[in-house]
Swiss-Prot record:
Subunit note: Forms a ring-shaped head-to-tail homodimer around DNA which binds and tethers DNA polymerases and other proteins to the DNA. The DNA replisome complex has a single clamp-loading complex (3 tau and 1 each of delta, delta', psi and chi subunits) which binds 3 Pol III cores (1 core on the leading strand and 2 on the lagging strand) each with a beta sliding clamp dimer. Additional proteins in the replisome are other copies of gamma, psi and chi, Ssb, DNA helicase and RNA primase.
Protein name as catalogued: Beta sliding clamp
Lineage: Bacteria, Bacillati, Mycoplasmatota, Mycoplasmoidales, Mycoplasmoidaceae
Biological process, per Gene Ontology: DNA strand elongation involved in DNA replication
UniProt keyword annotation of rRNA processing present: no
Any GO molecular function: DNA binding
Pfam families xref list: DNA_pol3_beta, DNA_pol3_beta_3
UniProt note: phenotype after gene disruption: Probably essential, it was not disrupted in a global transposon mutagenesis study.
Organism (species): Mycoplasma genitalium (strain ATCC 33530 / DSM 19775 / NCTC 10195 / G37)
């Protein structure tokens, strides 16, 4: 293999591909490598991890002198290319090594046998017409993911359905992005008609999707179909620019959540987000950012009082004005870190709280952002 390639184009690709690999993975070392494949008129770059695989196609600003393929350590290759100043780079396989050459630089990198690279789940014979598909505006999708991502569970020991975002298009009229760690629940609604579907995208894959920054307002395309081998998974291809992602979604049913929002509140209040946010941040500082710390919230017709007691450190009392109040007085124990995560997702400065009582979950919304609904379970 021998190619001439534009450094800027190569840098853009490697920067994103580097978000896929796991550097110095001693258990699965092949997850640290890139596969580079030069064909007659294009170059394909491959990378994978235990969750998904990625293919990037480049067919401009290249000159393919010899076809072939090689495998190279991903991070060091990315760092070396990033440190080169010249714009035109020669990449060549020579004596089972990778030669990176410019006018003033010559670097040799060890490679491994191509056959040692795990099978990439990209089949060039795939007929995409056999897949169901839908498109979402990329900016809108990323906006929704960022607003609810804090509710995704980081605990890999619980059910995997809580380690990602559920894409719920089951009614064919809207797409609901749903995330929960069983204590927090966040739902973002995208009004778009589609064929009915329902699948979960794992959090590492979502982080990779979030890393794109398209120059134009583009769409991301999701292709999906039930795996031919079993009914327990959904085969997916996700296309964005010149990248294609291969992913298998395990068909673990996400809980039905829309009915959680349908209750008659006993107490309703409206507060200023920034005032509440500042108070919660001070409490978190006192608690030394301990995410399992609990405090008490008292609600009456004029104010919301939050009392925090931290053993061996101190205590605090925060008073937040209620812009509106309807219903009964309440006293609730809650996690300030979780509440802070929820309210920071809103852009509006007026936040609505609907309470069912002292011990039941409560709803957090904003009239100016009806597409976002969030729930927090009180702590005992």
């Amino acid at each position: 293999m021998k190619i001439l390639i534009n450094k800027s184009e190569l840098n853009k690709i490697l920067k994103k591909m580097n978000n896929v690999i796991i550097s110095n993975n001693k258990i699965k070392p092949h997850h640290s490598y890139f596969l580079i494949e030069a064909k007659e008129k294009e170059i394909n770059f491959y990378a994978n991890n235990e969750y998904f695989s990625v293919k990037c196609n480049l067919n401009k600003n290249i000159d393919i002198l010899e076809q072939g393929s090689l495998i190279v350590k991903g991070k060091i290759f990315n760092d070396l290319i990033n440190g080169i100043k010249e714009e035109i780079i020669t990449i060549q396989e020579k004596d089972q090594t990778l030669l990176v050459k410019t006018k003033k630089t010559s670097i040799n990198l060890n490679t491994i046998n191509v056959n040692e690279f795990p099978r990439i789940r990209f089949n060039e014979k795939n007929d995409l017409s056999e897949f169901n598909q839908f498109k979402i505006n990329y900016s809108l999708l990323v906006k929704g993911i960022k607003k609810i991502f804090h509710s995704v569970s980081n605990n890999r020991e619980i059910s995997s359905k809580f380690n990602g975002v559920n894409f719920n298009g089951s009614n064919g009229k809207e797409i609901f992005l749903e995330a929960s760690d069983t204590y927090k629940l966040s739902v973002f609604e995208i009004k778009q008609e589609t064929e009915p579907f329902d699948f979960i995208l794992e959090s590492n894959l979502l982080s990779f999707i979030n890393s794109f920054n398209p120059e134009e307002d583009k769409s991301i395309v999701f292709y999906y179909r039930k795996d031919n081998k079993d009914s327990f998974s959904t085969e997916m291809l996700i296309s964005m620019d010149n990248f294609m992602i291969s992913y298998t979604s395990v068909n673990e049913k996400f809980p039905e959540v829309n009915y959680f929002f349908e209750f008659e509140p006993e107490t309703k209040i409206v507060v200023q987000k920034n005032e509440l946010k500042d108070a919660l941040q001070r409490i978190q500082t006192l608690a030394q950012n301990e995410r399992t710390f609990l405090c008490d919230m008292q609600i009456n017709s004029s104010e919301l009082k939050i009392r925090a007691i931290v053993n061996n450190i101190g205590n605090s009392l925060e008073e937040i004005s209620c812009l509106k109040f309807e219903g009964y007085k309440l006293n609730i124990s809650f996690n300030p870190s979780s509440l802070l995560d929820h309210i920071e997702s809103f852009e509006s400065n007026e936040i609505n709280f609907d309470f069912q009582g002292n011990s039941k979950y409560f709803l957090i919304t904003s009239k100016s952002e009806p597409e976002l609904k969030q729930i927090l379970v009180p702590s005992r």
